[in-house]
Amino acid sequence: MEKHLIALSVAALQAGAAPASADIKMGSLYPFSGPLALLGDESARGLEIAVEEINAKGGVQGEKIVLVRGDAVDNNQAIGEARRLISVENVAGIFGSFSSGRAVAASQVSELAGVPYFELGAVADEITDRGLENVYRANPYARDFAQMIVEMLQKKIAPKLGRDSKDLKIAVIYEDSSYGTSVAKHEETFLKEAGLNMVLSQSYPGNTVDMSSLVLDLKSAGADVVLQTSYQSDSVLFLQQANEGGYKPSAIVGAGGGYSLQPTADAVGHDVIEAAYDVDFTQFAVNTSFTPGLEEFVEAYKKKYGETPRSGYSLTNYVGAKVILEALNKVKGFDAAAVKQALSAVDIEAGKTAMGYGFKFDQNNQNERASMMGMQWQDGKLVTVYPDAAAISEIRLPQ
C-alpha cells in the first residue's frame, strides 16, 4: 500500500479515539457494496447478532455497544472509512473486514491511531505478520487453508479415488489479490513438502470475465485435481466454463470464498458443483456435538433476518466477536494495554465454541487455535466431510 494513502495526523486521529457518549461505538467495516458485498454483508450480520446478545446481557464494561458501519467497497475506500470511523465517529475499535486487501489497508490506519482492529474473517498472512500491536485476528488464516487442503487430499480424496496422492497431477489457480496469493503460496509449499506433483500454478485477475484459456491450460497440463482460491464471481465463471469446455477433473477443491456460498451452487447448477470440495471456516451442515451453540446461532439469524444463513462467514464473525467482546468486558478501557490484557487472557479449548475451534492469541495477535474444516457439495448442499469428528457424510466421487 502506498505510504501517501495512509499519511495521517497521528495526533488528530488519537484525539478522536475516545467515545463521545455513554454508549461505546465500534466500527463495522465491510464491503457492503461492490463485487464483495454479499459475503461482506453476510459477515457483518454475524457481528450484529453477537453485539445484540452482548448488549442483552449488559453490554461491555457497563455500556451498550453501538455499531457504526463503514463501506469498504475497495482498498482506498477502506482507508477513507477507517479514518472517518476513528476521527469523526470516535469509535473505540473496528471490526471487519472479510476482504484481506481491505483489512491490510484499513488496519494500517487503525494502528497509526492506536485504535484496536479486530479481524474476524480475512485470511492473508500479512494482516497479523506485520508486527502491528493493535491488530488482532480471531479466524484461521491462509496457511490453515493450505494445510487442511493438502491433508484432506492425502488422507481422504486420493484414497477415495483409488490413487496414490503422489500420482495425482495437481493444479493451483487463484485470484491475484492478497487472499488468493497468500493461500496459493502456502498450497505450493505444502504440496512440495508432501512430495506431491504440482503441474501448474497460475493466477488471474479477480474481476476476469473469461477463464476459457485457463481451462485450456489445465487440460493441457493434464491436471487431475484443481485447487482454486476465489471469490464468488470467479468461482461461478470457472465452474461454468470448465463444464462448458468438457473439463472434468477428478477433484476440484475450493478455498472458501465462492465455494462456500449457496448462491454459487444455485448459479452454476447443483449438477455442475456436485462433488466439488471446499475447505473453509465451519459451515452449518456439521456434527453439532463438535460445535456447541451453532444451532442457537442459526435460530437467532433466522429470527433477525428472516432467512437461513447464506454462508458460514456470519458464524465465524459471530463467534469471534463474542469472544473478543466478552474478553473486553473483563478489563477497563479500550487502550492498547487494556485490549492486550483482555485478549492475552483468552484461553478456550477446541470443541467449546460454535466454530468447533478454540481461542488463544499468540505473540502476533493471531488466534493460534483457529482451524478449518473440509466440506463437499452433495445434492445441492455443502456438508462437512472432514475431520471425522465433525463430519456428517462420507465423501462422494463425481458422476
Curated annotation (Swiss-Prot):
Keyword Repressor (UniProt): no
Keyword annotations: Amino-acid transport, Signal, Transport
GO biological process, one term: amino acid transport
InterPro entries attached to this UniProt entry: BCAA_transport, Leu-bd, Leu_Ile_Val-bd, Peripla_BP_I
Signal peptide positions (record): 1-22
Entry-linked SUPFAM superfamilies: Periplasmic binding protein-like I (SSF53822)
Pfam families: Peripla_BP_6 (PF13458)
Domain of life: Bacteria
UniProt keyword annotation of Methyltransferase present: no
Coiled-coil parts of chain: none
Family that this chain belongs to: Belongs to the leucine-binding protein family.
Biological role: Component of an amino-acid transport system.
PANTHER family, A to Z: ABC TRANSPORTER SUBSTRATE-BINDING PROTEIN (PTHR30483:SF37), LEUCINE-SPECIFIC-BINDING PROTEIN (PTHR30483)
Full protein name: Leu/Ile/Val-binding protein homolog 7
Species this protein is from: Brucella abortus (strain 2308)
